[in-house]
From Swiss-Prot:
Binding site for ATP: 41-48
SMART domains reported for this sequence: AAA
Membrane topology per record: Peripheral membrane protein
Description of how the protein assembles with itself and partners: The complex is composed of two ATP-binding proteins (PotA), two transmembrane proteins (PotB and PotC) and a solute-binding protein (PotD).
Catalyzed reaction equations: ATP + H2O + polyamine-[polyamine-binding protein]Side 1 = ADP + phosphate + polyamineSide 2 + [polyamine-binding protein]Side 1
Protein name: Spermidine/putrescine import ATP-binding protein PotA
EC number(s) from the headed UniProt entry: 7.6.2.11
Length: 365
């Protein structure tokens, strides 16, 4: 029996322009059924426009949008098997919780007894089974967010689109809701497409992340792949904190930066090719200055609760960010040490296709 590998959502060469301003630039995107995807990027990068294009609220200027293999560019939003949870939830204050959840079903003239059954089931999914009669003004922000999700799920979509739904919540509730959303997606087994500018949310919840900037998808992959193997300077800086240092790839598995040669885990580049070297702050260990692979001088530090964030400089005036469980004195020279696999080498201006091909080539060797 053949396995259906066709993506549930596919965008092919999709662009969107407003006059001369191009919001989306040749977007190609495949979403498989049953996974949690995140579009991650700064404000104005085009991530919400992609969401609206899939939902049918925005028309693509060019390119094709597919759902289960069928082009849906001209299909009205209310006929698409997707539902959207908006940033402001868009709940009706004059309706109670159950009435809000039932609203879409009533518009579609679903029989009353079926409405009651589906509303109760949807509320139970989001742990609000006992709050159906509550007014919207009587429930918390986190509960309002769950009502908005229940209202979308009650329509039994194949894809749920979520447009920064956690942004209005406080830090603790936002973290709690990350767990709840991930658990809900896994229990339901439907496709979630989540939009956020918060890299912590993306890393915590996603099966796959697409990092965007200026209307383009720069890199897609698992959270671990995106974090450990960023394709370029923007991705490395946007996904977590990074030390990014100019360097030179001497040969496979050997790189030079700050005037020294180091063993690394990268290959597939030209001898003496100019590169950028990434070292994450948490991968740097502090040792005595005479024992370090690098020597830096501490400039400042902040206590972050479970670690000290130390800013230091080397003799070439490169800034180094270090996360350590031990404090360091300002003005003190310290040694930094790290393992070869902690070094990530990035080519300048490498496309995602070329990046993926290079990784596959040297990982297979």
């Amino acid at each position: 029996m053949a396995v259906n590998t066709q993506p549930i959502i596919r965008l092919t060469n999709v662009t969107k322009s407003y006059g001369e301003h191009q919001v989306l630039k040749n977007i190609n995107l495949d979403l498989e059924a049953g996974k949690f995807y995140t579009l991650l990027g700064p404000s104005g990068c085009g991530k919400t426009t992609i969401l609206r294009t899939i939902a049918g609220f925005t028309d693509a200027t060019s390119g094709q949008v597919y759902f289960d293999g069928q082009v849906i560019n001209t299909l009205p939003a209310n006929q698409r098997q997707v539902n959207t949870v908006f940033q402001d939830y868009a709940l009706f204050p004059h309706m109670n919780v159950a009435e809000n959840v039932a609203f879409g079903l009533k518009l579609h003239k679903v029989p009353k007894d079926e409405i009651e059954t589906r509303v109760q089931k949807a509320l139970a999914m989001v742990q609000l089974a006992d709050l159906g009669e509550r007014e919207i003004s009587e429930i918390s922000g986190g509960q309002q967010q769950r009502v908005a999700i229940a209202r979308a799920l009650v329509m039994q979509p194949k894809v749920l689109l979520l447009d920064e739904p956690l942004s209005a919540l406080d830090a603790k509730l936002r973290k709690d809701m990350q767990y709840e959303l991930r658990d809900l997606q896994q229990r339901l087994g439907i496709t979630f497409l989540f939009v956020t500018h918060d890299q912590e949310e993306a890393l915590a919840m996603s099966d796959e992340i697409f990092v965007m900037n200026a209307g383009e998808i720069l890199q897609g992959g698992s959270p671990v792949d995106i974090y450990d193997e960023p394709i370029n300077h923007f991705v490395a800086n946007f996904i977590g904190e990074s030390n990014i240092i100019p360097g030179k790839m001497l040969k496979d598995f050997e790189v030079e930066f700050v005037g020294k040669q180091f063993e690394c885990a990268d290959a597939g580049m030209q001898p003496n090719e100019a590169v950028e070297v990434v070292l994450r702050p948490e991968d740097l260990d502090i040792v005595a200055a005479n024992q370090g692979k690098l020597v830096v001088t501490v400039d400042s530090q902040l206590f972050r609760g479970n670690y000290f964030e130390i800013v230091a400089y080397d003799t070439d005036h490169n800034e180094w960010l270090v996360h350590s469980t031990n404090p360091a004195a300002e003005g003190e020279p310290i040694g930094l040490t790290f393992d070869p696999q902690d070094i990530h080498v990035m080519r300048l201006n490498e496309s995602e296709a070329a990046f993926d091909a290079r990784l596959e080539q040297y990982e297979d060797d």
